[in-house]
Curated annotation (Swiss-Prot):
Enzyme class: transferase
Organism for this UniProt entry: Gardenia jasminoides
Keyword RNA-binding carried by entry: no
Known role: Glucosyltransferase catalyzing the beta 1-6 glucosylation of the sugar moiety of crocetin glucosyl esters to produce crocetin gentiobiosyl esters. Weak activity toward curcumin glucosides, but no activity with flavonoid glucosides, coumarin glucosides, 4-nitrophenyl glucoside or crocetin. Involved with UGT75L6 in sequential glycosylation of crocetin to crocin (bis(beta-D-gentiobiosyl) crocetin).
Gene3D superfamilies: Glycogen Phosphorylase B
GO function terms (MF aspect): UDP-glycosyltransferase activity
PANTHER family registered for this protein in UniProt: GLYCOSYLTRANSFERASE (PTHR48044:SF14)
Note: Crocin is a yellow pigment that accumulates during fruit development. No other crocetin glucosyl esters detected in neither flowers, leaves, nor stems. No correlation between mRNA expression and pigment accumulation.
Alphabetical keyword list: Glycosyltransferase, Transferase
Residues annotated as binding an anthocyanidin: H9
Protein name (database record): Beta-D-glucosyl crocetin beta-1,6-glucosyltransferase
EC number: 2.4.1.330
List of residues binding UDP-alpha-D-glucose: T130, A319, Q321, H336, W339, N340, S341, E344, D360, Q361
Length: 444
């Protein structure tokens, strides 16, 4: 397995690895030492025998020392540098494939150049998409049918979001063409297969549309959410869960924007005022880019912490997200709608209060609304979030009748996903076994 260098990618790879080893596979996960350190403590018991970690060392440069060989805490201006460094590690990855001789490779959909390496070693390979299928369907449609409206109107980008998305898409296309020229891409049967962190229960029509549009075979592997476990993060984690236990059922909202997006001061102020106006309990996870010397109280409105008192908790850097979402006192989740956060919300039946920031997040937010898993905080005409709109969305989700309806829909979605998960994983295990058999037979 070869994931992209982000915690939000490597976590689903680990969960998929666990489910495949339950079905008789042995797995190697290849990544940088700092990323492997993040998951090492989560490989326990029987999995410590069937899941092995393989270090991939990127070129070490003054501007990208080893602790920056991950997107977690990476200053945004170094993202392109990290991508170039990973591309520069192709020879080492090739040597790893030569040494391990795996039966097949599962690689990140963003790292398309991996396929050419696997061809050189006669190893079948499939892509793994850790984002939503609806997002991929939307952008593939724009590329294949420019000027024609996407056939699913619930999934759209506002004018403000389209401008940002166009720039990101152009950069991604240029990066892909530089490191994986279209003329050099292999065209094996397995190269049209995507494993996807999703379920037909929520994205079936988008899975079918991608096959109709581009003959891409999208195979769902379920939501791949780790079971809540007590994390070894010391007294702060224990104190937070104890505090949550003093609150009434579904009275508290979790606020978190993932490991890669850093809120501006203006965004933090609007969210803070929105939480204050809503009058609900909250846990707010705040993060600053690595190296920034800012205390949370310096970034928040003056007097905010004193005014909210015991109604809220500010946590810097990390909180046991799955444990908080699984807690009966949690009734809502204000998030950026990174795909991992969306599927965790579905897994634990907690309505989403969507505040998408960039990349795939706006499209994920629209899917959340479409399937009834939450509501979106609408930006103003300038593309900014407003405190009153934030407070309104929180109250709708947590206090008003709409919140009860959303919770009921969320539980229905959760049930439908759970019904399909085992069958979907069994089908994927069967297909991977078949790929290996066919490759072995063709080599003999």
């Amino acid at each position: 397995m070869f994931p992209w260098l982000a915690y939000g990618h490597i976590s689903p790879y680990l969960e998929l690895a666990k489910r495949l080893t339950d079905r008789g596979f042995a797995i190697y996960i290849c990544s940088t030492p700092i990323n492997l350190g993040f998951i090492k403590k989560r490989i326990t018991g029987k999995y410590s025998v069937t899941i092995k970690l393989v270090e991939l060392h990127l070129p070490d440069t003054p501007e990208l020392p080893p602790h920056y060989h991950t997107t977690n805490g990476l200053p945004p201006h170094l993202m392109a540098t990290l991508k170039r460094a990973l591309n520069g590690a192709k020879p080492e990855l090739s040597n790893i494939l030569k040494t391990l001789k795996p039966d097949f490779v599962i690689y990140d959909a963003t790292q398309t150049w991996t396929a050419a390496l696997t061809v050189a070693h006669n190893i079948p390979a499939v892509k793994f998409l850790t984002s939503s299928v609806s997002m991929l369907a939307y952008f593939c449609h724009l590329f294949m049918k420019p000027g024609i409206e996407f056939p699913f109107p619930a999934i759209y980008l506002s004018d403000f979001e389209q401008a940002k998305a166009r720039t990101a898409a152009q950069d991604a296309r240029a990066d892909a063409e530089e490191n994986d020229p279209a003329a050099e891409r292999p065209n094996r049967d397995c190269d049209s297969i995507f494993l996807v962190k999703s379920s037909r229960a929520i994205e079936g029509k988008y899975i079918d549309y991608l096959f109709d549009l581009m003959k891409l075979k999208m195979l769902p592997v379920g939501m791949l959410v780790e079971e809540p476990v007590k994390d070894d993060q010391g007294d702060n984690s224990n104190e937070l869960i104890q505090w949550l236990g003093t609150k009434s059922q579904r009275s508290t909202v979790l606020v978190s924007f993932g490991t890669e997006y850093f809120l501006t001061k203006e965004e933090m102020e609007e969210i803070a005022h929105g939480l204050e106006l809503s009058e609900v309990n909250f846990i707010w996870v705040v993060r600053f880019a690595m190296g920034q010397k800012i205390r949370p109280d310096e970034a928040l409105p003056e007097g905010f912490l004193e005014r909210v008192g015991d109604r809220g908790r500010i946590v810097e850097g990390w909180a046991p997200q799955s444990e908080v979402l699984a807690h009966p006192s949690t009734g809502g989740f204000i998030c950026h709608c990174g795909w991992n956060s969306v599927v965790e919300s579905i897994e634990f039946g907690v309505p989403v209060i969507a505040m998408p920031m960039h990349l795939d997040q706006p499209l994920n937010a629209r899917l959340v609304v479409e399937i009834g898993a939450g509501m979106e905080v609408v930006r103003d005409e300038t593309g900014k979030f407003d405190r009153k709109e934030i407070a309104r969305a929180i109250k709708d989700a947590m206090v008003e009748k709409t919140g009860e309806n959303t919770r009921a829909k969320m539980l229905d979605v959760k049930g439908r996903v759970e019904l399909k998960e085992k069958q979907e994983l069994d089908e994927v295990a069967e297909l991977l076994t078949q790929l290996v058999t066919e490759t072995t037979q063709s080599s003999n």
